[in-house]
């Protein structure tokens, strides 16, 4: 029908993770945790998310609806679950790790226009399902590191029964037929609710969910039973009988104290051993050396700090998921627990508001974002951190706001970004040359930003160079605006150093205040949170938390504040 179907048997194994009864049961974390366990058994694992929405990618979605956009090394805007995959597997994934209905239909329609289907009537089956299968099977090829995986774990978004998910489930069913039943494992995540009035756990929702899955031709090999408490053995036996799975394959997964405990929960229930046995994979013991040390740092901190996250989307923490996980990982590096104070940036627009929201925190983080709302509050928070000597880290938009605040501090009172004020007299932040058409509405917004990993050169002896332990770094980006080079010399008179640039020196990547002026005041145009791992904290986040610990233990005295500025701030407070 215009495409070649895969019929040959393969050494690579496929695990499909589906969900039933309700959304937000933790399919992504379950898949990530299983991937971590198989990796700890010495297997090469890669992961993929199938999203049933019609958007080509989440890049243009409202963060309040979808959460953060996770950017891969090769510049794809992907689902936040891909971030979980990278953190749990401790490896970089490519753009192939996220497939959407929008991508599938766009590809099929483009092929039809080119005449690749040789006059066929293009239909959901086989053309859409074949395209999905090709995307799934492509994960068996060499990854970004040039290695071929032993196992591909594919999470199917949505809930069984959703119209949008049907082509993806059908494609998964066909893959079991194409590559051999011994090479595919179906894992279904379902809810077992507890009814307080009767004091009972109810199995009917899971039974109906599995029945819906079987109705489309998929018999699950194992069930993840999500509940707020342990599912007793008697109920496991009942579910096993009614859903036609082995009792050992009914995995009780009560809520865990930390997401990093989930691999231990699954291992205790024997899921990884069951998967290895069913797929005929080599059996090796789990090496808990690295993950065990992580759990020790998670549950046995020696210190505690509070970090204010001053953002626009704080009503939905998932909008900053990688940032919060990177902060916590930075704490793990110092064996410290990081408590996050969510501060809506609007609260910090005045000196009094900033003081009320931030006066007793140990560090401040200014994350990325888009649009004018809340910008003056971010600038106000930066001013408070600079004048009070509070450790600060700015990310992407955070760097731009740091530059705006520095410019205003030296008399450019109306300094701004052309994103917020196109006709500003002092555009210290301007549109990148290759982004002007998109900003003007003359080109697509989706997928057109400066995306993916780019190198930077750091100034020798700078705060950031010492944090990284290197003068050559690479970070992921997602932005359309940059520091206006025409203002660099002028802004430098404020004391702000441009300590990292692109290799050609044209794009500002890092700014900072020297260590002798401020304990830690750093911002980057990049998104370093995307490369942080719980077992390998990112250097900038580790440095921020280390500075926060020192700040907490030291006397909190203002640092190098002019008398008139100090008096003004105190009057405002």
From Swiss-Prot:
<feature type="binding site">
    <location>
        <begin position="24"/>
        <end position="29"/>
    </location>
    <ligand>
        <name>ATP</name>
    </ligand>
</feature>
<dbReference type="InterPro" id="IPR027417">
    <property type="entry name" value="P-loop_NTPase"/>
</dbReference>
<comment type="pathway">
    <text>Pyrimidine metabolism; CTP biosynthesis via de novo pathway; CTP from UDP: step 2/2.</text>
</comment>
<feature type="domain" description="Glutamine amidotransferase type-1">
    <location>
        <begin position="306"/>
        <end position="554"/>
    </location>
</feature>
<feature type="active site">
    <location>
        <position position="529"/>
    </location>
</feature>
<feature type="binding site">
    <location>
        <position position="81"/>
    </location>
    <ligand>
        <name>ATP</name>
    </ligand>
</feature>
<feature type="binding site">
    <location>
        <position position="23"/>
    </location>
    <ligand>
        <name>CTP</name>
    </ligand>
</feature>
<feature type="binding site">
    <location>
        <position position="155"/>
    </location>
    <ligand>
        <name>Mg(2+)</name>
    </ligand>
</feature>
<dbReference type="GO" id="GO:0046872">
    <property type="term" value="F:metal ion binding"/>
</dbReference>
<feature type="binding site">
    <location>
        <begin position="397"/>
        <end position="400"/>
    </location>
    <ligand>
        <name>L-glutamine</name>
    </ligand>
</feature>
<keyword id="KW-0315">Glutamine amidotransferase</keyword>
<dbReference type="GO" id="GO:0005829">
    <property type="term" value="C:cytosol"/>
</dbReference>
<keyword id="KW-0436">Ligase</keyword>
<keyword id="KW-0067">ATP-binding</keyword>
<feature type="binding site">
    <location>
        <position position="419"/>
    </location>
    <ligand>
        <name>L-glutamine</name>
    </ligand>
</feature>
<keyword id="KW-0665">Pyrimidine biosynthesis</keyword>
<feature type="binding site">
    <location>
        <begin position="202"/>
        <end position="207"/>
    </location>
    <ligand>
        <name>UTP</name>
    </ligand>
</feature>
<dbReference type="InterPro" id="IPR017926">
    <property type="entry name" value="GATASE"/>
</dbReference>
<feature type="region of interest" description="Amidoligase domain">
    <location>
        <begin position="1"/>
        <end position="281"/>
    </location>
</feature>
<keyword id="KW-0479">Metal-binding</keyword>
<dbReference type="Pfam" id="PF00117">
    <property type="entry name" value="GATase"/>
</dbReference>
<dbReference type="Pfam" id="PF06418">
    <property type="entry name" value="CTP_synth_N"/>
</dbReference>
<comment type="subunit">
    <text>Homotetramer.</text>
</comment>
<keyword id="KW-0547">Nucleotide-binding</keyword>
<dbReference type="InterPro" id="IPR017456">
    <property type="entry name" value="CTP_synthase_N"/>
</dbReference>
<dbReference type="InterPro" id="IPR029062">
    <property type="entry name" value="Class_I_gatase-like"/>
</dbReference>
<feature type="binding site">
    <location>
        <begin position="162"/>
        <end position="164"/>
    </location>
    <ligand>
        <name>CTP</name>
    </ligand>
</feature>
<comment type="similarity">
    <text>Belongs to the CTP synthase family.</text>
</comment>
<comment type="function">
    <text>Catalyzes the ATP-dependent amination of UTP to CTP with either L-glutamine or ammonia as the source of nitrogen. Regulates intracellular CTP levels through interactions with the four ribonucleotide triphosphates.</text>
</comment>
<feature type="binding site">
    <location>
        <position position="81"/>
    </location>
    <ligand>
        <name>Mg(2+)</name>
    </ligand>
</feature>
<dbReference type="GO" id="GO:0003883">
    <property type="term" value="F:CTP synthase activity"/>
</dbReference>
<dbReference type="InterPro" id="IPR004468">
    <property type="entry name" value="CTP_synthase"/>
</dbReference>
<dbReference type="GO" id="GO:0005524">
    <property type="term" value="F:ATP binding"/>
</dbReference>
<dbReference type="InterPro" id="IPR033828">
    <property type="entry name" value="GATase1_CTP_Synthase"/>
</dbReference>
<dbReference type="GO" id="GO:0019856">
    <property type="term" value="P:pyrimidine nucleobase biosynthetic process"/>
</dbReference>
<dbReference type="GO" id="GO:0042802">
    <property type="term" value="F:identical protein binding"/>
</dbReference>
<feature type="active site" description="Nucleophile; for glutamine hydrolysis">
    <location>
        <position position="396"/>
    </location>
</feature>
<feature type="binding site">
    <location>
        <begin position="202"/>
        <end position="207"/>
    </location>
    <ligand>
        <name>CTP</name>
    </ligand>
</feature>
<dbReference type="GO" id="GO:0044210">
    <property type="term" value="P:'de novo' CTP biosynthetic process"/>
</dbReference>
<dbReference type="GO" id="GO:0004359">
    <property type="term" value="F:glutaminase activity"/>
</dbReference>
<feature type="binding site">
    <location>
        <position position="238"/>
    </location>
    <ligand>
        <name>CTP</name>
    </ligand>
</feature>
<feature type="binding site">
    <location>
        <position position="369"/>
    </location>
    <ligand>
        <name>L-glutamine</name>
    </ligand>
</feature>
